């Protein structure tokens, strides 16, 4: 068997096995980790979008909290600052302004500066183009203005 076929089979086996690794922890443990991630980023508060989702789409909310937050966001290897900058860049690049805004808010909450977020937008021009970066800049400008007004 050729090496690339073996590599392909191994990749397929690992891809199937990966979701089962998350099952080693109970859903309750994963949800607790997810809740802890959100609260660590959101000044000890829950996330309003996630809380609204619980009302109408409980399965989606639980999956988001257990998998995205409890399994992925709580992994070692990257600090919260790096994760948030990556999330802002990714959401800006795909044009998901609402999610980008949430993660930019988290980034500001944990000490990322407005200037650093602006640099992320500048970087987005390279892989995603100016229209996506301009849209992201508008969203960040709104967020910055709201946060400045809310300060005493």
Describe the function of each predicted region.
Residues 83-91, 120-121:
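Short, structured motif recognition centered on aromatic/hydrophobic residues
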Residues 1-10:
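Bacterial N-terminal signal peptides that target proteins for export
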Residues 62-65, 94-100:
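Short acidic alpha-helix initiation/capping motifs at coil-to-helix transition points
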Residues 9-19:
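Bacterial N-terminal signal peptides
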Residues 123, 130-134:
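Substrate/cofactor-recognition hotspot
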Residues 93, 127-130:
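Alpha-helical transition-metal enzyme core signature, strongest for iron centers
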Residues 22-81, 109, 133-152:
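Acidic, glycine/proline-rich low-complexity segments that act as flexible tails and inter-domain linkers
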Residues 96-118, 134-144:
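Extended intrinsically disordered, low-complexity coil regions enriched in Ser, Thr, Gly, Ala
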């Amino acid at each position: 068997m050729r090496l690339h076929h073996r590599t392909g089979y191994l990749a397929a086996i690992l891809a199937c096995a990966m979701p089962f690794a998350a099952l080693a922890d109970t859903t309750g443990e994963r949800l607790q980790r997810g809740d802890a991630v959100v609260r660590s980023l959101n000044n000890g508060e829950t996330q309003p979008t996630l809380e609204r989702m619980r009302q109408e789409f409980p399965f989606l909310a639980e999956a988001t909290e257990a998998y995205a937050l409890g399994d992925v966001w709580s992994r070692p290897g990257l600090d919260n600052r790096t994760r948030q900058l990556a999330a802002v860049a990714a959401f800006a690049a795909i044009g998901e302004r609402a999610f980008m805004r949430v993660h930019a808010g988290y980034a500001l909450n944990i000490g990322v500066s407005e200037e650093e977020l602006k640099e992320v937008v500048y970087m987005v021009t390279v892989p995603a183009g100016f229209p996506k970066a301009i849209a992201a800049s508008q969203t960040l400008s709104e967020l910055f203005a709201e946060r400045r007004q809310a300060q005493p």
